[in-house]
């Protein structure tokens, strides 16, 4: 009990039903197992998953932070969707076949080395797979991901992946959306890692810690097409498109705001190429705007009135300002309201203007600001008007007198005497060509059609054309439509004055065309128009234009700023409180550049100078002008309506008479020169700065120090050091390859040596087997039956026999003596046996015979069958060593017999079991290295196949001719090589011994076969008589059981045969003494031929002994 408590407290915890129920109670789940769809078994120390058979309804199983080493025990969780096994000891993904609905599998922080068993065939709906913090390394370990067709979220972070082939594997996952690869070495190995993975994974939306937007994919594709330059261009295009979207959304919001007031769309579209410096300039003006907003509108109007009342005239100007004062309205935002006029005050206003000054208040829509800059090298814009006695002619009057001349000046009174209908003064002289103003007014035709003399003078006086700046070219190319001034005259004809560039100069062209509704117009407004009448809003609006010039930074009156209002168009921009929508630039130029200051010195009052500058800059704020036709009688009906809301329609500003005088007083010639000088200086500065930077950049990198890792390095030394390191790496690689190559060559040389030794052994075995085959072929040849020699053949003795006759005389004599003794003994025995009983004789003879005869007689006793005796493998002892003492000497001279005796002696010493034991023992010595040697044999076979077929080679040496050779060849194949070179000699010795033993055994078996064949083929007859060896081949019927009859027949046959052979032997001995016996192959079967006669002495002696 104590041990169980200790194991439960400290040892690995086992997952039991009781522990699972306790976990359910702890987490407020159901005690009934099948009612739970989620189960928390985490942080419990379990070492195996078990006892979950009853929880068949689980959909989410938490098993993290345990000691689980194997995934099993989930056979009954068929509805499982989420399985969390992180922070365990799992080494293999397995046993998930039953979880077909698994959607999320978390196996992070385990010991997994290979991804397997999670393909679409096993987990068909797997969507999320987390394998972070494992031991994945090569692409082979990750190749199974190709079969995960529905995995869209994959986490492989913090593994050991270092094979860049994983890019192709991830590219094959068509549904992959989210990928995490941080913490792997391959991240640093893949060039342009993020772009490469975005290009390979077509549907990837999130990579590592950042999302993949359409812009990232487009930039990656551009990088693939044209490198980093194409990527930069694509990124710039996307940025511009995003800016356009932002502007469109803002403009849409502003349009909705204006539409709410019942107004048309009057928003200005921002330029795509708007300078970024405007934002910084707006920031600089913020400080001044704060000071401006602190003042009230009443104070601002008071200051404006003081500016224009420095030289008041009678009651006219005061009346005007009184009207303005009564009609102005102020708010907290500094916006003014448009002054309304009434029909009743039109005539009164005209009279006031006549009394004060010949100038009229003109409502004007200024031309584009680009026209101001284009007036440097061309004629001033020509404003056209046509006099008419019945109608009010719309005109622009430019006063040539000084503003400070006062009402007492003659020019001032002369201007007062002129009727307003006859005042048409148009100044056409450029400040560059005329030192003073032309006081004579010019007619409309003179303005439109200048004389040839004037044209020639203008061409001669004009300076050499200067190239326009890039900003000017940009403006001219993008806003050609703004360079045309359309003017309506009396006969409903429209005169179009177009400014075109030619050779760096701007040339005005005048065209006559039908009137257009979109032309720019000028309109005369009397002082009576400035009234509090509540008429309907007018339809006079400004056209939306964009200011692109870098030297002019002006915000149009139709801009979408919340602080703008119509009232800033009514007053000059002198007072910033009343006109806060203007941003001043130091390089601004105006339309007043066309005017030339008179010979009188300019006014030195700072207030008046500031007013002139402000008015000059204010004139370029407008873009268009309208000249409307109106009859004198309808002039009183002309009204200006004020909108009812703060964000109302835009109306054309009204310019004061005093402002016009100040505009004429000061010339912009100095400003033009200053602007040109500044432009030239800025251009020179830019060029100098570029040249200076180019000189500072020395392209000779070899003489410069480069920064690497925060330290300076000499370029040459660093390059040499890097080259040296690369060379060392290359040399190390070459050394490794060379060492491996030497190892392979040594291994191949060793194989060659072993094969050479084996081939030598094969050659020796082949030679020996060839000798055996030749020997067998000689044995198989049937000997021809010898014929009875005639007298002539007896006389013809071969020379070889004569040569060897002397050497064998003594042997023949001994043989004759031995044959005589055998014959006499046989005859004596045959006489004795004839008188006695056959059985008793048989017993006596068997008892008194020698050891050889006893063996033979024992074999033919009545209890043995004669057929069994004759067919017995044991050879019959037919030789009596006492009677034939010198027979061995005769056969020892025969080489075949000697070989047979040697083989027989070896076979007697070494049995088949012993040979088998030797081979088995040799095989057992190499059993431990069988696998390695088998691989080596395979390499040897592959090496030799390119030269010859080894099987055909072995067949050629006749190794398959015998089963023993096949067995031994198998032994040689398994043990022909050694693992260590020192064992080669011992293996060769073992093989040599085994070959020798095999040769002996083979020779023994082959010689036994030879003996069997020789017994069957040794029936040699002379005249139809059989030899003595026929005794062994006599077939006895199984029914013949009378041994006595058989013995009688044999005895009679032997006696008759002996007598005949003795006579023939004596004759042969006398005639052919010393003849050499030839082809003596077997003692039992080969007859001895002397002079063509056949001796069968041994068989006859055996027969006599048997008798």
From Swiss-Prot:
Query: Which GO terms fall under molecular function for this chain's record?
Result: dynein complex binding
**Which terms are listed as keywords in the entry?**
Cell projection, Cilium, Leucine-rich repeat, Repeat
Q: Which Gene3D superfamilies does this one have?
A: Ribonuclease Inhibitor
Q: Say if the entry is tagged with keyword Repeat.
A: yes
Question: Where do the LRR repeat units fall?
Answer: 34-56, 57-78, 79-100, 101-122, 125-146, 150-171
Q: Compositional bias (Low complexity) spans? A: 549-560
Biased-composition ranges for Acidic residues? 446-459, 531-544, 844-855, 1098-1107
Q: What's an example Gene Ontology biological process for this entry?
A: axoneme assembly
Location relative to the cell: Cell projection, Cilium
Similarity comment text for this entry: Belongs to the DNAAF1 family.
> What function does the entry list?
Cilium-specific protein required for cilia structures.
Name-wise, this protein is Dynein axonemal assembly factor 1 homolog
């Amino acid at each position: 009990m104590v041990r169980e408590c200790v194991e439960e407290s400290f040892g690995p915890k086992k997952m039991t039903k009781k522990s699972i129920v306790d976990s359910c109670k702890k987490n407020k789940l159901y005690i009934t197992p099948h009612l739970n769809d989620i189960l928390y078994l985490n942080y419990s120390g379990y070492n195996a998953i078990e006892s979950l058979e009853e929880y068949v309804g689980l959909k989410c199983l938490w098993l993290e932070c345990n000691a689980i080493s194997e995934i099993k025990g989930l056979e009954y969780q068929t509805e499982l969707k989420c399985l969390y096994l992180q922070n365990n000891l799992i080494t293999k993904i397995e046993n998930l076949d039953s979880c077909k609905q698994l959607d999320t599998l978390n196996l992070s922080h385990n010991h997994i080395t290979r991804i397997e068993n999670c393909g679409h065939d096993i987990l068909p709906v797997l969507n999320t797979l987390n394998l972070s913090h494992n031991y994945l390394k090569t692409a082979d370990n990750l190749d199974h991901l190709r079969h995960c067709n529905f995995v869209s979220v994959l986490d492989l972070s913090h593994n050991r992946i270092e094979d860049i082939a994983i890019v192709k594997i991830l590219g094959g996952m068509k549904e992959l959306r989210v990928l995490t690869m941080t913490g792997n070495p391959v991240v640093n190995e893949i060039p342009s890692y993020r772009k490469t993975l975005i290009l390979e994974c077509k549907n990837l939306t999130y990579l590592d810690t950042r999302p993949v937007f359409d812009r990232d994919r487009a930039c990656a594709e551009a990088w693939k097409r044209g490198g980093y330059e194409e990527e930069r261009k694509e990124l710039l295009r996307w940025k511009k498109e995003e800016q356009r979207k932002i502007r469109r959304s803002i403009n849409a919001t502003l349009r909705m705001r204006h539409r709410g007031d019942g107004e048309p769309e009057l928003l200005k579209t921002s330029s795509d190429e708007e300078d970024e410096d405007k934002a910084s300039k707006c920031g600089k003006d913020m400080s001044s705007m704060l000071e401006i907003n602190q003042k009230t509108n009443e104070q601002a109007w008071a200051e404006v009135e003081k500016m224009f009342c420095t030289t008041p005239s009678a009651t006219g100007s005061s009346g005007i300002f009184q009207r303005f004062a009564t009609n102005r309205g102020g708010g907290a935002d500094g916006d003014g309201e448009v002054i309304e006029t009434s029909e009743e005050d039109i005539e009164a206003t005209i009279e006031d203007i006549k009394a004060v000054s010949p100038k009229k208040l003109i409502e004007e829509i200024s031309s584009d600001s680009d026209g101001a800059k284009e007036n440097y090298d061309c004629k001033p814009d020509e404003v056209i008007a046509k006099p008419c006695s019945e109608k009010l002619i719309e005109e622009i009057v430019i006063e040539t007198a000084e503003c400070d001349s006062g009402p007492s000046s003659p020019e001032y009174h002369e201007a007062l005497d002129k009727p307003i209908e006859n005042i048409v003064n148009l100044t056409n002289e450029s400040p560059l060509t005329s030192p003073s103003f032309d006081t004579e007014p010019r007619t409309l035709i003179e303005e439109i059609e200048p004389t040839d003399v004037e044209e020639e003078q203008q061409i001669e006086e004009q300076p050499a054309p200067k190239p326009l700046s890039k900003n000017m070219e940009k403006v001219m190319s993008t806003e050609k439509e703004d360079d045309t001034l359309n003017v309506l005259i009396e006969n409903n004809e429209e005169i179009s004055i177009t400014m075109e560039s030619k050779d760096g100069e701007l040339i005005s062209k005048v065209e006559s065309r039908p009137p257009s509704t979109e032309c720019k117009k000028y309109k005369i407004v009397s002082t009576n128009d400035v009234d509090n009448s509540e008429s309907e809003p007018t339809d006079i609006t400004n056209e939306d234009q964009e200011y692109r010039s870098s030297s002019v930074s002006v915000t149009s009156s139709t801009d979408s700023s919340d602080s703008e209002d119509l009232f800033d168009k009514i007053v000059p921009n002198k007072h910033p409180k009343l006109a806060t929508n203007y941003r001043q630039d130091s390089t601004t130029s105006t339309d007043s550049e066309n005017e030339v200051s008179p010979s009188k010195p300019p006014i030195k009052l700072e207030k008046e100078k500031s007013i002139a500058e402000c008015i000059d800059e204010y004139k370029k704020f407008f873009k268009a002008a309208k000249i409307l036709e109106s009859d004198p009688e309808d002039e009183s009906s002309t009204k200006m309506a004020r909108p009812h809301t703060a964000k109302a329609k835009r109306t054309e500003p009204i310019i004061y008479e005093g402002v016009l005088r100040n505009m004429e007083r000061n010339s912009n010639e100095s400003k033009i020169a200053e602007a040109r000088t500044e432009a030239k200086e800025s251009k020179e500065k830019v060029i100098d700065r570029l040249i200076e930077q180019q000189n500072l950049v020395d392209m000779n990198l070899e003489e410069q120090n480069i920064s690497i890792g925060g330290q300076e390095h000499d370029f040459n030394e660093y390059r040499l050091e890097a080259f040296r390191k690369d060379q060392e790496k290359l040399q190390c690689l070459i050394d490794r390859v060379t060492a491996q190559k030497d190892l392979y060559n040594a291994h191949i040389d060793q194989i060659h040596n072993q094969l050479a030794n084996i081939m030598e052994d094969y050659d020796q075995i082949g030679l020996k087997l060839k000798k055996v085959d030749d020997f067998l072929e000689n044995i198989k040849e049937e000997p021809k039956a010898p014929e009875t020699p005639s007298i002539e053949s007896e006389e013809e003795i071969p020379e070889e026999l004569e040569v060897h006759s002397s050497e064998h005389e003594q042997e023949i004599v001994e043989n004759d003596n031995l044959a005589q003794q055998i014959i006499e003994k046989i005859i004596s025995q045959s006489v004795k046996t004839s008188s006695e009983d056959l059985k008793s004789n048989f017993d006596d003879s068997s008892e008194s015979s020698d050891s050889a005869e006893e063996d033979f007689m024992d074999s033919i006793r009545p209890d043995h069958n004669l057929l069994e005796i004759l067919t017995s493998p044991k050879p019959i002892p037919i030789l009596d060593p006492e009677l034939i003492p010198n027979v061995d000497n005769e056969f020892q001279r025969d080489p075949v017999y000697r070989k047979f005796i040697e083989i027989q002696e070896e076979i007697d010493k070494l049995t088949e079991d012993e040979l088998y034991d030797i081979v088995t023992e040799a095989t057992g010595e190499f059993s431990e290295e069988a696998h390695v040697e088998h691989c080596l044999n395979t390499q040897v076979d592959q090496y030799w196949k390119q030269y010859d077929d080894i099987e055909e080679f072995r067949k050629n040496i006749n190794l398959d001719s015998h089963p023993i050779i096949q067995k031994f060849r198998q032994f040689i194949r398994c043990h022909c090589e050694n693992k260590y070179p020192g064992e080669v000699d011992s293996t060769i010795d073992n093989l040599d011994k085994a070959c020798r033993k095999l040769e002996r055994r083979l020779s023994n078996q082959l010689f036994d076969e030879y003996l069997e064949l020789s017994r069957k083929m040794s029936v040699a007859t002379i005249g139809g008589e059989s030899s003595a060896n026929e005794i062994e081949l006599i077939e006895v019927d199984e029914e013949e059981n009378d041994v006595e009859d058989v013995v009688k027949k044999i005895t009679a046959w032997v006696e008759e045969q002996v007598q005949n052979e003795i006579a023939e032997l004596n004759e042969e001995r006398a005639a052919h003494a010393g003849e050499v016996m030839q082809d003596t192959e077997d003692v039992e079967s080969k007859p001895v031929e002397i002079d063509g006669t056949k001796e069968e002495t041994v068989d006859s002696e055996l027969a006599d002994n048997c008798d």
